[in-house]
UniProtKB/Swiss-Prot annotation:
The gene is rpsB. Coiled coil: none annotated. InterPro entries: Ribosomal_uS2, Ribosomal_uS2_bac/mit/plastid, Ribosomal_uS2_CS, Ribosomal_uS2_flav_dom_sf. The lineage of its organism: Bacteria, Pseudomonadati, Pseudomonadota, Alphaproteobacteria, Rickettsiales. GO terms for biological process: translation. One of its GO terms (cellular component) is cytosolic small ribosomal subunit. Belongs to the universal ribosomal protein uS2 family. The keyword Ribosomal protein applies. CDD domains: RPS2 (cd01425). It comes from Rickettsia canadensis (strain McKiel). Keywords: Ribonucleoprotein, Ribosomal protein. This is Small ribosomal subunit protein uS2. One of its GO terms (molecular function) is structural constituent of ribosome.
Amino acid sequence: MSKIPSVNIKELLDAGVHFGHKTSRWNPKMGSYIYGERDDVHIIDLRQSAVLMSVALNAIYETVKKDGKILFVSTKIQASDIIAEYAEKCGQYYVNHRWLGGMLTNWKTIAGSIEKLNKLEKTLGNEEALMGYTKKEILDMSRKKDKLLLSLAGIRNLNSKPDLLVVIDTNKEHIAINEAVKLNVPIVAVVDTNSNPDNVDYPIPGNDDSIRSIRLYCSLFADAALQGLAESMKASGVDMGAIQEHTDKALTSKSVSKLKQTKKFSKMKNIDEETNTEFEQALNDADKNKNSENA
């Protein structure tokens, strides 16, 4: 059984995962993941979010367990630093500024840019070599290095296509998703109410704008990857005492077939009554708190 992070509805609710976009901005393909609307804002069905997050976390865990590589992608401002932080935490790869066209499909060009970055760093770190350059030339090299680092820092050690792509905001990262589809790289993605989930293998219905939500997603992703790494190292005979334990609860992953994902929640048999009750209670508690604050 995989020891990946547990997901509970209250945690998702507290992070604002249930808040979608204004009802006028929705994508009809997300209809089966929407619980309802309040104040002209769609409310995401966290019962499905919890189950599908479990499925996605298991995919991350299994990928790393089998020594696969994961590429985290989100170039939006509020996610940029968070993506880098958690990707580095679990020893994986990331793109958190601009996605350069061809990062996956034209790797030869990207590899050339990485080689250029390495040469610039080597030159700038050699005081003797810098003696032959003017101050302006050194400044130009430094600027080129910084520009390349913004785009390539998180993938400079990636020497082949990733085994799994993890995306926050499918609309903004549509180029990355299209490239992954062309190369048959499976995709985990947070899909908001204005998203198109069609090309996503492991969709997670949720708010893709809130910093609290994004941090929660990335924390869960990183912990699942670390658990996969621990299993991989254990299988290789590595001393497990060197690996920090990040979770103390085992999660039983609940599977949802792609056919059932297109149906309304009420028809999905994989979500139990306990999850139903938890979601309804969490929403009621949130309403009570809101009403008491406005009283």
